[in-house]
């Protein structure tokens, strides 16, 4: 009877030991997963900082291109009477300015593919991250349209301007072209420039909106990270 009772007690002891060990293992695993999630979110926040710098540059570049086209459209009737270096600069900005947005989606994909995204408590963070990277593909398509428009216009620029020096502006674009044309900008070229301006403006507005959303996303990520008791 005593032996039977001892066996039962030992079995119960082993069960308790196993249960506690299993609980601690699961808890440690859960803590580890939470740590990985937070590391990914921190990296995404750092990527956001880099993206914000790139997008602010892009917004300035596309604003400059749009303003150059507006100037050419407004002054085309009097183009031959204006300073050749000014006209050449505006044509160069109108035709050549384009951007290529390069983002880093590695952390987002890792968070998504590992299932760690399910550990994010704030649903707003999940939705904001997903919407951000979806929108990037759209921006790249707009940029491709602008590059293609510029490629179509380059023959006119090369035929009617000459690069006198290789000085760059504050954004890194050439500002040394001088107008050598003998006529105002032909209407087909002017109309294509107007189309290009519309795309620049559309892109610039989308980027400004993305800048606001990325700043808000950084704040949301900060709130999510503050929920981790290990960080408080």
How would you label these PLM feature ranges?
Residues 1-31:
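Membrane-embedded hydrophobic alpha-helical segments
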Residues 23, 27-232:
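Long, hydrophobic alpha-helical segments that serve as membrane-spanning/inserting helices
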